[in-house]
């Protein structure tokens, strides 16, 4: 105890030398913790029971403890007993309790004797230069105030965290759209208590293992005063999953009006049965903002909806603390915060299906992809690593054959080359000849003007739908230069190629002149994916039946009013100097991060990123636990690149993602 604390206690006639008397009989039915620095659930673990009679001599106690130890029976090495160095009141026995149990009872004793009447101290500037503006209207009475004794006990158990000025002001957390189309019972905001609520807490959480305490949340409504409507702020206890129903109003709640001029502040209390939460603990108190009365704008018409924006800001509560310091680089077993899944600048965004730059987002009813798509469990249903490099195979053919089956030399799934493309051909083909591209009148297309003017493009090429690869083809004794290779997934039947949307080692189809003669020639082939022969087709990856999978094709549809999206880029076409769109389920950086790191995200939530274009338009992208991306608008429109991305936090998946892009509305 420091001298300052001792003087304060003496001033109030307290003896700073605290005397603790513990009855060891209270230890008899208390379980012990096998990880005393981490666990706080002693009642769930096996009981301890090592004890000795006080009537025995010290030597007898010593020998009994050694002979009763499990290690003695196997190693015959003496282990000295550990007896707590303190006086035991009413002691009929000497115990050897686990340190975690001992600390548990010591902390409880301290907490029981804590005086709630001790004064509070406040540090202020002596010249009045530091002032605090009115930050909002505090709404109380929602639930019981935080337990100061538990907070103090947690401090004594684990050490107090650092104080700083960031604790005093509100920081932006997210913004939520509230439109006139939202009906009563619609959840606009749901957030579980934890460090992810505040950017400073999120940053400092990297230094600690555990936390405890409340968080203050401030809501500001951007309405112009002509709106009517009310929102309900509901405190939901741990273990309850919020539902979009007015039955949620049976929980403690308060109301605030859309015409509220001043910000409204709520406190999310920390309701817990333990001294602190680990960073993996997501089953905490939740704050839910629900539509109580529909939003009304008398100046809106029936052809479109209008709304306002609810801005959410947070700061740690007075009892918020971090516990159990750790090195910032060490990884927690439960996962880290998904704040680095999208690079800040769009100049670093390339697709996970093809390596060109992302140029747009495409909203589809369903999004699907297996290859190079990773989820939050670091798993993929595909066969490729999240990187682009040349494909390496060997191919053996004879008698001048050009169609053969490749054998993988670099793979993560046996028999399937790492990086092999994931779409198949549109129908049966006999690969031979040259390009055959005509318009609707069967006239050859030979110029850009003819291609752009054609109302119909007919692709009669006998190797259409295959990928074009630059090739380094080598075989002993073969002095000829390498030829372009055309590859796909399909079944080779003689000279015929049959499409297949499932892949295995027998379907690595390669169409290439490897200069084989009468005898079998085995070539070492290094292939770089450059283009595509599917002239006139829809975007690559848009047709579910042509997307290749090993067995399962991961797929997602709309969730909670949010629509799944593809990330669009393009690949160059063969013959015509044009490109074709490619649909990617993820940005390659996202795939790479998900494959390398274990992130913390529950199945009912999104990791939310705000995308802002060069004109200031913005929308939120939510990435779910399966790695798919969603937006809250039905149409994004043209964006002005470059774009920037910033991490916004975790949001419930059933809540529509925010944006300032107005969807196109049609009156029927």
Curated annotation (Swiss-Prot):
GO cellular component: host cell cytoplasm; T=3 icosahedral viral capsid
Cross-referenced SUPFAM superfamilies: Positive stranded ssRNA viruses
Record bears the keyword Disulfide bond: yes
Residues the UniProt record annotates as site (Cleavage): 124-125
Pfam family, one: Calici_coat
More details: Mostly expressed from a sgRNA. Expression from the g-RNA is low and occurs at a downstream start codon generating a smaller, truncated LC-VP1 (tLC-VP1) protein.
Sequence similarity: Belongs to the caliciviridae capsid protein family.
Physiological role: Capsid protein self assembles to form an icosahedral capsid with a T=3 symmetry, about 38 nm in diameter, and consisting of 180 capsid proteins. A smaller form of capsid with a diameter of 23 nm might be capsid proteins assembled as icosahedron with T=1 symmetry. The capsid encapsulates the genomic RNA and is decorated with VP2 proteins. Attaches virion to target cells by binding to feline junctional adhesion molecule A (F11R) and/or to alpha-2,6-linked sialic acid. Once attached, the virion is endocytosed.
Subunit structure: Homodimer. Homomultimer. Interacts with the minor capsid protein VP2. May bind to VP3 and Vpg proteins. Binds to alpha-2,6-linked sialic acid at surface of target cells. Interacts with host F11R/JAM-1/JAM-A; this interaction allows viral binding and entry into the host cell.
Protein name: Capsid protein VP1
Organismal lineage: Viruses, Riboviria, Orthornavirae, Pisuviricota, Pisoniviricetes
